[in-house]
Design a protein with these regions (language model features):
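Hydrophobic targeting/anchoring helices
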Residues: 1-159, 244, 262-273, 277-291, ...
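Active-site proximal loops enriched in glycine and acidic residues that flank catalytic Cys/His/Asp
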Residues: 26-29, 51-53, 93, 137, ...
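Extracellular/periplasmic catalytic domains that process cell-envelope and extracellular macromolecules
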Residues: 126-129, 190-192, 227, 317-318
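Helical hinge/lid and interdomain linker segments adjacent to catalytic or ligand-binding clefts
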Residues: 154-249
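Conserved beta-strand segments of alpha/beta enzyme cores
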Residues: 175-177, 302, 322
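A glycine-rich, often tryptophan-bearing local segment used as a flexible ligand/cofactor-contacting loop or short
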Residues: 209-284, 289-291, 305
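Short, hydrophobic/aromatic-rich segments at coil-to-beta transitions
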Residues: 298-304
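Conserved small/polar residues in nucleotide/adenosyl-binding loops
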Residues: 371-373
Length: 373
């Protein structure tokens, strides 16, 4: 099956998918998240990634630079391969067009050699995982890696600030699982299996959960998890719905709230930026993408970045646990490092920062492990 433009009804992460007797899944690889969307599928003999660029005239024309596009595609996908490899790679299109670019053909040869070397060393092994991370939304595992994805790795103004989180995680040294609100209802102790929970997206969407945050069982489970030492990272408008005087239902964990008009007459004083472990590699400028306006910090929070009195990054403590708020985080090497630090801080694991670590955030270190550390 080619997992591409149309695959409704063939949800590859549902348990029923493994019963249909499919031999293999092939899909277009636009970035790390799309690679994991393919490589994490279970119950097939092999998975294959169709790398970019396709041999089509939009790239293979006079003055075009298919080699550059191929390099960006490979470097982006490679970090995800090191976490969970596909079994085969390939390219597609009109071969006649590719033959007109000998540099491109030479580069593809080098990619194939590198892939074989990586595959021989990592297939069947367990990658080093510094912490266990859960992405909480309405779909859970059914849309693993495909949430915030409309078309393979295509930019959309409305969601690139959130898709960057999933992209960063696709090649990061974490054991990543996707869970739903129903999973928590059915298994109240489920969160004990994780170190950090993320909720990412806009309000009143399946990404963040909408009215699920009115459910006492959900609120109790998440608050108990954090209070006992877990971490919660909210991106965009996390845990949000207007209810009982709050918009962010976990404002007490995140330390921030969104002004929706009900607290305009409440003075807000917490606007000072502070240095922090999370931003040590970030420099003065952080790319929050579209970001968010009208987010203000509660007195207990520590603001790390604000723009025009709109909080973009803040941290807070809740019992023995910690909360982190991020307004948005498009994928980049720098932002991938920021998210890595944010997860470690949320998990109270700053001391593990230098395990398999590069001080240059443009370089990522991948290691193999037989157990989670």
């Amino acid at each position: 099956m080619f997992l591409g433009d149309h695959w409704i009804g063939m949800e590859p992460f549902m348990e029923e998918f493994q019963t249909i007797g499919l031999d293999a899944v092939v899909g277009s690889v636009g970035n790390g998240a799309t690679l994991r969307l393919i490589s994490d599928i279970e119950g097939v003999r092999y998975t294959e990634g169709r790398f970019l660029p396709y041999f089509f005239p939009d790239t293979f024309h006079e003055g075009g630079d298919p080699t550059r596009e191929a390099k960006v595609n490979w470097v982006t996908a490679r970090r995800a391969i090191l976490r969970k490899p596909i079994d085969r790679i390939g390219y597609g299109g009109y071969l006649k067009l590719a033959t007109q670019f000998p540099d491109f053909i030479d580069y593809v040869e080098s990619v194939c050699k590198e892939f074989r070397e990586l595959y021989e060393n990592i297939k069947g092994t367990t990658p080093y995982c510094v912490k266990r991370v859960a992405i909480l939304n309405c779909w859970g595992k059914m849309r693993a890696w495909g949430n915030h994805m409309v078309h393979h790795a295509i930019y959309y103004k409305q969601n690139y600030s959130y898709a960057g989180i999933i992209e960063a995680l696709s090649g990061a040294p974490f054991d990543v699982k996707f869970i739903s609100f129903d999973d928590i209802r059915n298994h109240p102790d489920l969160l004990d299996s994780f170190d950090v929970v993320l909720n990412v997206g806009d309000a009143y969407t399946a990404y963040t959960g909408g009215d699920n945050w009115k459910d006492e069982a959900i609120l109790t489970a998440v608050r108990r998890f954090v209070y006992r030492g877990g971490g919660f990272i909210g991106v965009g408008e996390p845990a949000s719905c207007q209810w009982q005087g709050h918009f962010f239902q976990l404002a007490d964990i995140l330390g921030v709230e969104e002004e929706t008009g009900y607290t305009l007459n409440v003075d807000k004083y917490n606007w000072q930026d502070h240095a922090h472990f999370i931003t040590e590699d970030s420099g003065d400028a952080i790319d929050f993408g579209e970001g968010k306006k009208n987010i203000f910090a509660l007195e207990s929070a520590t603001v790390l970045r604000q723009i025009d009195k709109g909080v973009q990054l803040a941290v807070n403590t809740f019992g023995q646990g910690r909360g982190v708020y991020i307004s948005g985080l498009p994928y980049s090497f720098a932002n991938s490092r920021l998210l890595y630090r944010a997860i470690l801080w949320a998990a109270s694991a700053e001391g593990k920062i230098h395990r398999w670590f590069s001080t240059n955030y443009n370089v990522e270190v991948h290691a193999l492990s037989l157990i989670h550390i």
